[in-house]
Amino acid sequence: MAEIVDVRAREVLDSRGNPTVEADVVLKSGVVGSACAPSGASTGSREALELRDKDPARYMGKGVLKAVDAVNTSIRSALIGRDAREQRELDRIMIDLDGTENKANLGANAILAVSLAAAKAAAQEKGVPLYAHIADINGTSGQYSMPVPMMNILNGGEHADNNVDIQEFMVQPVGVASFREALRVGAEIFHNLKKVLHDKGLNTAVGDEGGFAPNLPSNEAALAAIEEAVTKAGYKLGSDVTLALDCASSEFYKDGQYNLSGEGKVFSSEEFADYLGDLSQRYPIVSIEDGMDESDWDGWAALTRKLGDKVQLVGDDLFVTNTKILKQGIDKGIANSILIKFNQIGSLSETLDAIKMAKDAGFTAVISHRSGETEDTTIADLAVATSAGQIKTGSLCRSDRVAKYNRLLRIEEELAGSAPYRGLKEIKGQE
């Protein structure tokens, strides 16, 4: 038994300088597992609750001492003496202790930090890498693959202070045989994009996730800049590298319309679906995330009808890693992929349940960071353990993003060929 003898938490800072929860789970053997909860900027309204203190005298109300206290008192008392290897049991205890649908009492940030810390402690106790332990929990031991990275190299929306409406413009190096090579391709494109923007007299400052955030006249201008960077890096757009968008449409949806203020355009749901379809015909865009507002299910149905057989349509704010909402989407034929952010649901077990439900329905699952990250690299292990096939963890700068890429490099080296990199085959509609 990997007996838990202590559970403790502290307030630490995330990559945006805001407080978040770090938890330690201590075992009788002396092993300590530590993990941090991430935090989002553009958030779905149905996400599990991130408990903040709302004390304006500390961190402008964003302190997390209440969540830390929940870990140090009620969660600690409930978990001491339990077996850290029994992940689902630990998560169930914390969920029951909270007693709400959205983890509003203890906070999803408190529960998740402990959930992940327990998994790390159990992995250390077993003497196995974290991905191997997560695969054991998930029933996917030995079925590993390396994920295709969606590299967010140009930012707009809530992730940047500019006039570009679409939140993320991403490259996916699909025409290579390993994650290591994919990372190299992405880095070379990133550096070439910086030069392209600089030569046009544009800002090369970066946003929350490490992507560039210049003022551009349109979303298409962002795609054209990336196309130029891909070419300058010596790669071919469409075969070596494909494109992905995160529209984060809920951020510009108002009164039943999509308002692209940067371009001075307003669209109905059908018109915006056509707009995205037009972009994906003119550029090799193979994945579109949150192409419609989270509440616009008719719009999602239209988008899926128009593009669902050839473009991966990822629900983030739409599904918020929640199996109940995902099941509704599956039943109604809406979207064909889910973004997985474990702080949207608040525990490792529930995250694994969402991935399994998606895969069983023929959906893909894209493992994702948040805009407020830490040095914690658990999502890298999660992607490999579940053979998810795709990961979103930002651009090719900022240590909070690069840490995940470097963890994946080490995992690929460790697995020595037993975790294939499948490229385009991992993306829905491109199999």
UniProtKB/Swiss-Prot annotation:
Single GO MF annotation: phosphopyruvate hydratase activity
Gene: eno
Compartments where located: Cytoplasm; Secreted; Cell surface
InterPro entries: Enolase, Enolase-like_C_sf, Enolase-like_N, Enolase_C, Enolase_CS, Enolase_N
Keyword Transmembrane tagged: no
Annotated residues for binding of (2R)-2-phosphoglycerate: 167, 341, 370-371, 392
Organism: Hahella chejuensis (strain KCTC 2396)
Amino-acid positions noted as binding Mg(2+) in the UniProt annotation, renumbered to this chain: 246, 289, 316
Family to which the UniProt record says this protein belongs: Belongs to the enolase family.
The protein, known as: Enolase
GO terms for cellular component: cell surface; extracellular region; phosphopyruvate hydratase complex
GO biological process, one term: glycolytic process
Pfam families: Enolase_C, Enolase_N
